Amino acid sequence: GGETLLTYLGQLRHRSLPDILPSEELLDEVRDYFTPFFGAETAGECADVLRRRRCLSTANHHHPAFEYMTVQDTILCDRWLRTQGETGAVVPFLSCANPRLDNNVYPRGMLVYDCTAPEGCLRLPFYPFKLRHACVAAVEGISPDMVDNALNRLRQETRRGSCSLRTADALERFCREVLLSDRVQRCGTLREQTTVINAMLSQRYFTDRAPQYLWMPMETLTARLLERDFRTEAALTGQLLFRRELRAALLQALDGVSGCWTGDTSGTHFFWGLDRRAALFPLRLRESVGAAALAGQNSLGEAVTV
């Protein structure tokens, strides 16, 4: 408790582990994901940081980064990388895009912190309440109409004294310059918009530098790597999923383990479906003679088999 953050970060050490699968494949997919958003040079620098440090934060949900713990975490990661000799111009993050819009980091809208306001914190939604169960990875992007509605709500809250004029002015400027920018609006989904929004946000964090915090949803990266593996018959992932005896042993070993399968009772599941409401639902492996399928029930009560 008596140390500065910089002193504490200087004591952190990361021990690189050997590759289970070729790391260059991951770096290729990182470059391919970020290039359309930021260009080949920035995407390449992001991959180079990962190659040099082999370490990044995976602690955050994929959402426009307004929530205070998210901002603190990303800044700390930035500072740690700089203690390791990086310039901090590009800081990569892996984030989880599967949470719902009603998650506690509030991907449904903006969390506004204002110490001069009566409540100290204000929520300004972009998405309607009826979409609260939708998955962040699957919803459409923040539209100009959504931004206008949020700004109207902000003006009402300002008149009520729930938000200071100074904070309201900063928020309106952010909405006009970032959320309504061509860079953000040409992205069709909230998942893509989040990658651009957070890079633009981080460039406003400091007065002496303008780093880009590059967020990549880990589900997108995982899907791309799985597609690579499935094209190679001998790949580890394909062997685990499609060789029946290996799959059975894996399911048995991991059933009930925290963070893994828990059978038909509760907890997490390895496979998920996504229905037309953009809601996630668990899919469970069902095996019969000579065949395997994934089965579940979506949020509409419909039986689904894959």
List the predicted regions and their residue ranges.
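N-terminal catalytic cores of NTP/NDP-binding nucleotidyl/phosphoryl-transfer enzymes
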Residues: 40-87, 92
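Structured mid-domain segments that build the active-site/substrate or prosthetic-cofactor binding neighborhood
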Residues: 87, 91-97, 305-306
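Structural alpha-beta junctions
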Residues: 78-91, 117-120, 207-213
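An acidic- and aromatic-residue-enriched active-site/binding cleft used to recognize and process polar
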Residues: 58-62, 93-99, 217-221
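A short acidic (Asp/Glu
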Residues: 66-74, 99-109, 225-232
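N-terminal regions that are enriched for targeting/export leaders
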Residues: 1-63
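Extended, H/D-rich, highly charged conserved domains that either
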Residues: 193-304
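Internal, well-ordered alpha/beta segment that forms a basic, Gly-enriched binding/recognition surface
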Residues: 94-199
